[in-house]
Amino acid sequence: MERYFDQLAVMGVNLSEDMSAEVDKELALRQMSFAQLNDSPEVLNALEEEMIEPLCRRLRQTGCSGAFVLLDATVNTRMEGAEHSRAGLYVQKSGADTPTVPLLLYRGSAEVGKAHSVMPHRKWRMEFQTDQFPDYDRWMTPGSAPLYQSYTLTERLELP
């Protein structure tokens, strides 16, 4: 069991590095800073477009049921509850763990998901609500340890 979680941790670190590279590439292309992602729905959509295939590929390579990428930005800082609303993607396997199992979109652009044959689930929402993540603020505080030593296993979290 310990080996299984070690492998998941390594895959999580690799996913984080891959997604960070996608964000860096898109920001450099647009000559933007990360802070400028707020209130930039077209750029956030473009990021999700770039991230969805690598995210789905990584998910299919694992024995876990879902994978997500959360960006510390929102499409609309003026909407009610925006302080807890964050862009990103959450994709989940819809059934048995096979290489061709259909994937479902729980968070992210429905248009991006559909374009990649990842259909929105009935619980789909555009963005994550970070007030539903236990200890979210603590997880978002940069640590001094290397990424491969910074992961933590948490209790199962059910999306509303």
Where on the chain are the PLM-derived regions?
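Juxtamembrane extracytoplasmic/periplasmic/luminal helical "stalk" adjacent to the first N-terminal
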Residues: 1-46, 63-65
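Residue-level signal for functionally critical sites in structured catalytic/ligand-binding pockets
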Residues: 10, 51, 153
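Amphipathic alpha-helical segments that form well-ordered structural scaffolds
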Residues: 11-15, 54, 135-138
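Short regulatory alpha-helical segment in sensory/regulatory domains of signaling proteins that mediates
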Residues: 20, 52-62
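Well-ordered, non-membrane alpha-helical segments in soluble/globular domains
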Residues: 44-53, 132-134
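Extracellular/periplasmic ligand-sensing ectodomains of membrane signal-transduction proteins
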Residues: 58-160
